[in-house]
Amino acid sequence: MITSEEIKARLWNGSNELRGSMDASRYKDYMLGLMFYKFLSDQTLKTFATTAGISKEEDWFEEYKNAHQEYDTELEKMIQDILGYFVRPEHLYQTWVQDMNAGNFEVQKVTDSLNQFERSIAVTNGSDDFKGLFSSSTLDLTDTALGSNLNERNKNIQALIRLFEDLDMVALQNGDVLGDAYEYLIGQFAMESGKKAGEFYTPHQVSEVMAQIVATNQNITSIYDPTVGSGSLLLTVKKYLSEELQKSL
């Protein structure tokens, strides 16, 4: 599996190549948004495969599509009950990649996928957990900063999707590599953004001190960040809590 340092270098170098003149505080929304959507897609496939007893990872995508055709909303409900969300086959990150490989990728399909995810969450459990996560104000794929015309935006967005294409986000998350990479990217984007960084990032040294203070309390039932931007402070707190305590939150 790719190491923490390898993934940090790969993602940061990739972001520098792809973002062009776009401000770092803006580009982070696109990069981290698609990175998270890849995780949601991977987790959906992993959950389906585990439940269905499918061991060969290369079969998960096709088997999921076939199962969805047969069971439709029944399958969606099963995954929803386990994860709290689901991603339909036609909206999976893997489907975008498949379309790219076939030469029929359209940016609009990415927008449709992100919008459908939010709608499905709102309808199925009424939760606000994901509300606005992929809104057009955060991930505006028509933004001319991504390219002056549709073809250029199409090319740049495909390149960004390719950056996460072969990464197993579930495995990386289980090994804390994903969290480390996320924190690293947030920190790098913050340094690039200068004064604007205060809007979305608590300096890591401050997060460490706060996390260590909070973690001394073994009777924690909830943790809140009143000024949450990137969520990096909550990730830092998690590192100092026992696995048992993490599960109880």
Task: Give names to the regions the model predicted.
Residues T216-T221, S242-L249:
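Secondary-structure transition/capping motifs at alpha-helix termini
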